[in-house]
Amino acid sequence: MAITKNKISFFLFFLILFSSASFAEPYKNLSEYNFFKDIKKQIPADNVIPYKIANPLFSDYSYKFRFVHIPENKAAEYSYGSVFKFPIGTTIIKTFAYPIDERNLEEGFKLLETRLLVKNDFGWIPLSYIWNDEQTNAYLKYTGHTFNVSWISEKGEEKFVRYRAPNVNQCKSCHEINEKIQPIGPKGRNMNIDFNYQNGKANQIDYWQKRNLLKNIPNILNENPAIWDDINYNISDRARSYLDANCAHCHQKGASANNSGFYLNLDETNNSILGFYKSPVAAGRGSGGLKYIINPGKPDESILLYRMNSTDPGVMMPELSRNLKHEE
């Protein structure tokens, strides 16, 4: 059997992972971590904090339940413009699920996978747990998994998707910056919003601070996100927020699309680097015969929109996390 480059990469990743003296072997069952009071209903334990982010990645209309466990007497550090600096022992938890009927979420969800990012002396370790059919537990799996999923949409339409849980090596393609795996979502501009906690609504950053889970917070918080689907924000800021959430994890310096010279992180200000009148470095048929990544005022002549609208695996962007077009 031929050994592909991807298989070699996968093997080397785990060789390094398990040769680290600081790496404790992960649990085989998600329930063994005791992150949840009710694992099926995703009700967290008292030492696990639920959260949401302002502009989440589109993942084929899946719902995501996010949580973080920070060790007792430890705290994350606020870092302006970037992901919070979490202490060793932190676990970031994200469960992907689809509702039975989106018109009535009380009917429940079909849980598919729970991803963990575990921080230890080695760095951040990605792990994926696949849920059983009985929805009683999820089991560690390194090689990915595919689900055929159906659900009823808000419009009462039956929807279908072939949902792919990535293998652990694929996690690096989105989470690796300068050859180090790190979280993506928990940063000031994503967290500076309200969350409905069991004891009432509160700003997430204030809530974390009051629970001594976040320190070094600026006196004036000026990281206020433009919500991409909120018409109260101007269209330019909404577009930048969407592209930052859905593209910038790869399209930024030091990330997997570094060589493209095309970056979409919010703090990028150079129009050429943002793709204005920029020809692709190597898009192949992904260019669709178009000349510029962004042709201002001409979205139908822009490679960016062409690839975002495509569902062809050889063309579409992002390459992972979606099989459907984001109609909205």
Regions found by a protein language model. Name each.
Residues 19-20:
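N-terminal signal peptide c-region/cleavage motif recognized by signal peptidases
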Residues 76-81:
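Short alpha-helix capping/helix-loop boundary micro-motifs
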Residues 23-69:
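N-terminal pre-domain segments of enzymes
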Residues 26, 102-328:
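Sequence context surrounding c-type heme c attachment/ligation sites in exported
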Residues 86-89:
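Short, well-ordered loop/turn sites that connect or cap secondary structure elements
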Residues 2-11:
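Bacterial N-terminal signal peptides that target proteins for export
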